[in-house]
Amino acid sequence: MAAVTEVVVPADGAEARPLAAEELAAQKREQRLRKFRELHLKRNEARKLNHQEVVEEDKRLKLPANWEAKKARLEWELQEEEKKKECAARGEDYEKVKLLEISAEDAERWERRKKKKNPDLGFSDYAAAQLRQYHRLTKQIKPDMESYERQREKHGEDFFPTSNSLLHGTHVPSSEEIDRMVLDLEKQIEKRDKYSRRRPYNDDADIDYINERNAKFNKKAERFYGKYTAEIKQNLERGTAV
């Protein structure tokens, strides 16, 4: 008797299970690839940002130590210049407008700080007086940022000098700058003449000096110590001094 072979025909559900498993694996693989691409983009972005930070830090290290303070000061001065122009356009006095915006406490604190920073100790010698005048004049110099930007655009990379730069002596001041310098010098000369005018000579006065400088010294000595030496001088004139 011949053997009978049984053939099992798979159902539709059995065929669907391997297909579903393959689709699930493909979806997981696609998710992993997508996540990998996102991580790759984030890594490139982080690398770019780190490079920018390194460049910015290198620039900051090459700047002067007080660069931030200078920058803030220049920005404040630019704002002050803009306010002055606005007041001039309206026909107002900037100093008066500024005083209206400052409280009494701020004004007093500002005066104390100014006196502490640059105290007036009186005349000591000509070198100290000249140094004090130099500091006062340099504080009055206002930066011209428009001219600065024009020169920087004109010279490009050569504007920031190196060991091979040859920019010295090539700058030609404008007529406005020359006029401003002349006006400032005229003001200095006028002020100097006002405070150092020659006193008229009195022929009837007693001559107790050997030159003009000694005469000024004697006047100062008389002003401070005259009341203490008056009796001694009288005794010397009468011949009764001990």
Curated annotation (Swiss-Prot):
<feature type="cross-link" description="Glycyl lysine isopeptide (Lys-Gly) (interchain with G-Cter in SUMO2)">
    <location>
        <position position="233"/>
    </location>
</feature>
<feature type="coiled-coil region">
    <location>
        <begin position="65"/>
        <end position="91"/>
    </location>
</feature>
<dbReference type="GO" id="GO:0000974">
    <property type="term" value="C:Prp19 complex"/>
</dbReference>
<feature type="cross-link" description="Glycyl lysine isopeptide (Lys-Gly) (interchain with G-Cter in SUMO2)">
    <location>
        <position position="142"/>
    </location>
</feature>
<keyword id="KW-0507">mRNA processing</keyword>
<keyword id="KW-0832">Ubl conjugation</keyword>
<keyword id="KW-0508">mRNA splicing</keyword>
<dbReference type="GO" id="GO:0048568">
    <property type="term" value="P:embryonic organ development"/>
</dbReference>
<keyword id="KW-1017">Isopeptide bond</keyword>
<dbReference type="Pfam" id="PF08231">
    <property type="entry name" value="SYF2"/>
</dbReference>
<dbReference type="GO" id="GO:0005634">
    <property type="term" value="C:nucleus"/>
</dbReference>
<dbReference type="GO" id="GO:0071013">
    <property type="term" value="C:catalytic step 2 spliceosome"/>
</dbReference>
<protein>
    <recommendedName>
        <fullName>Pre-mRNA-splicing factor SYF2</fullName>
    </recommendedName>
</protein>
<dbReference type="GO" id="GO:0071007">
    <property type="term" value="C:U2-type catalytic step 2 spliceosome"/>
</dbReference>
<dbReference type="GO" id="GO:0007095">
    <property type="term" value="P:mitotic G2 DNA damage checkpoint signaling"/>
</dbReference>
<dbReference type="GO" id="GO:0000398">
    <property type="term" value="P:mRNA splicing, via spliceosome"/>
</dbReference>
<keyword id="KW-0747">Spliceosome</keyword>
<feature type="modified residue" description="N-acetylalanine">
    <location>
        <position position="2"/>
    </location>
</feature>
<dbReference type="GO" id="GO:0016607">
    <property type="term" value="C:nuclear speck"/>
</dbReference>
<dbReference type="InterPro" id="IPR013260">
    <property type="entry name" value="mRNA_splic_SYF2"/>
</dbReference>
<comment type="subunit">
    <text>Identified in the spliceosome C complex. Interacts with CCNDBP1.</text>
</comment>
<dbReference type="GO" id="GO:0008284">
    <property type="term" value="P:positive regulation of cell population proliferation"/>
</dbReference>
<keyword id="KW-0175">Coiled coil</keyword>
<comment type="similarity">
    <text>Belongs to the SYF2 family.</text>
</comment>
<keyword id="KW-0007">Acetylation</keyword>
<keyword id="KW-0539">Nucleus</keyword>
<dbReference type="GO" id="GO:0007369">
    <property type="term" value="P:gastrulation"/>
</dbReference>
<comment type="function">
    <text>Involved in pre-mRNA splicing as component of the spliceosome.</text>
</comment>
<dbReference type="GO" id="GO:0001701">
    <property type="term" value="P:in utero embryonic development"/>
</dbReference>
<dbReference type="GO" id="GO:0071014">
    <property type="term" value="C:post-mRNA release spliceosomal complex"/>
</dbReference>
